[in-house]
Every structure is written in C-alpha cells, then in structure tokens.
UniProtKB/Swiss-Prot annotation:
Gene that this polypeptide is encoded by: rplE
Family according to the record: Belongs to the universal ribosomal protein uL5 family.
Name of this protein: Large ribosomal subunit protein uL5
PANTHER family: 60S RIBOSOMAL PROTEIN L11-RELATED
Function: This is one of the proteins that bind and probably mediate the attachment of the 5S RNA into the large ribosomal subunit, where it forms part of the central protuberance. In the 70S ribosome it contacts protein S13 of the 30S subunit (bridge B1b), connecting the 2 subunits; this bridge is implicated in subunit movement. Contacts the P site tRNA; the 5S rRNA and some of its associated proteins might help stabilize positioning of ribosome-bound tRNAs.
GO term, biological process aspect, one: translation
C-alpha cells in the first residue's frame, strides 16, 4: 500500500517534471531518496535525561527509533569528551519518509508561528534541501504539556536531482510552500 505522497509522485509529479525538463527516461526524473532528522543536544553534557527525552520526541515525530550520535573527538572548550552522547539522528526512507513529508508539509509547517513560507535558497548545490525547525511542538505527535524543553531539529531532504532548480521543482510539486 502506497501513501498519498507516493501516489501523487507517480501519477502527477513524474509527468510534470518530464514535460518541464524534457527527460528522455522516467528513471532520469528526480526523486526523494531519504529524509534525515538530526537533533543536536549540546546541553546533554550536564544532564543525561535530555538525551532520553530528545530520543522520545524524535521517535514520536519520525515513527522509528533514532540513533544516539556521539562526539568524535574531545573539545575542552565545550566540556565534551570523546564518545559523549551529543545528539540524536534518524533516517527515513520509503513509505515512512513519504508519510513524514506529508505530515510535515500539510500539518506541521502551517503550525509554525509567523509562518510565511520556507526559504528557496537552502539548497546545497547538488539538489539536496535543508530546513531548520526551531521548536519540536509544531508536530502534532508531541504533546505540549509533556515536553521538558523546546528543542530544534534539522531536516535534510536528499534527492537524486542534479541541480537545485530540479530539486526545487520536485519539492514544489509536493506542495512545499516556498516563499521565493
């Protein structure tokens, strides 16, 4: 069973992008390969409970358990030793990825305070898109009363697009609300 976004991609987006960019094969059409959610937790050095709460939040948002990222090397200025847990990360692919993107675009983004659209300039030059979320409470799975602190997260959308223009057209076809 495919999700709403998967069906939309196969039925409408592929045809639109072929006419817009003149691809010769269906396999040339850019597609989203993975979505990575990353939460950096610098304040977890002092309190170990922060990691548990962040992992719980990411699990609710993503629908799968994140991996705890550890410090690669010691940095005395930040009071970090090698191997310290300093973040949490989860990679979504396939059906879970499309379900997350659907919830993100239709439910979470409109709940952002003073939302005027997302920047169209956050592409990396190779067709991938990054967006930072300041508060995890924009996701409906997170209950406002049960959180201990407001935490932001970075969402990286990796595509097979060769250029930023192709990637922007792909994400715009998925109803991403770009402001420029």
């Amino acid at each position: 069973m495919s999700t709403r976004f998967q069906e939309h991609y196969q039925e409408k987006v592929v045809a639109d992008l072929i006419t817009k960019f003149g691809y010769k094969s269906v396999m040339e059409v850019p597609r989203i390969t993975k979505v990575t959610l990353n939460m950096g937790l610098g304040d977890a050095v002092n309190d170990k409970k922060i990691i548990e709460n962040a992992v719980g939040d990411l699990t609710k948002v993503a629908g799968q358990k994140p991996v705890v990222t550890k410090a690669k090397k010691a940095i005395a200025g930040f009071k970090i030793r090698q191997g310290y847990p300093i973040g949490a990360m989860v990679t979504l692919r396939g059906q879970r990825m499309y379900e997350f993107l659907d919830r993100f675009v239709t439910v979470a983004l409109p709940r952002v305070r003073d939302f005027r659209g997302i920047s169209g300039k956050a592409f990396d030059g190779r067709g991938n898109y990054n967006i930072g979320v300041k508060e995890q409470i924009i996701f409906p799975e997170i209950e406002y009363d049960k959180i201990d602190a407001l935490r932001g997260l970075n969402i990286s959308i990796t595509t097979t697009a060769k250029t930023d223009e192709e990637a922007k057209a792909l994400l715009a076809a998925f109803k991403f609300p770009f402001r420029n």
